[in-house]
């Protein structure tokens, strides 16, 4: 099992003009983030995006110099449209990320304001090969501290021993995790980390 540490990137989910997921662009972005096929990927993108040859060459040099080197990727987080993509699309994105054999952990966003849905998404992600899951604090419903702990216990059990990263982003959820709740969550064996985005 991978250890989740170092620099991670929440990967964007690219869409085409028809609002369908661009899976090829997603795979190129994954390769870029781990430093794989820089020049080939940069050249392919530059060829289609820039008509001027000097601009293409500058872009390609920048791409190769600035890319790669992350220690884990997060698929289907907030940036990855985790709350908005369809179930089939979620599964395909996880399959693509895991199937890319990046050599680094793939963390999958599986949070929901429904415990039942969060459990199902977590089970699916783990079954598809996710190395860890990122679970946002349930949004909109504003559960009590007891409800929050119960929610995370259920999700952690569904993760089958894989690390669970708690995601505290009160600006999006309307609920801030307080230290007393975090202390209880930390007692759950596979709660491994907190992504803290409260701004405090």
Can you say where each PLM-predicted feature lies in the sequence?
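Active-site beta->alpha loop and helix N-cap motifs at the rims of alpha/beta catalytic domains
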Residues: 1-176
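Catalytic alpha/beta core domains of metabolic enzymes, predominantly
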Residues: 156-162, 169-200
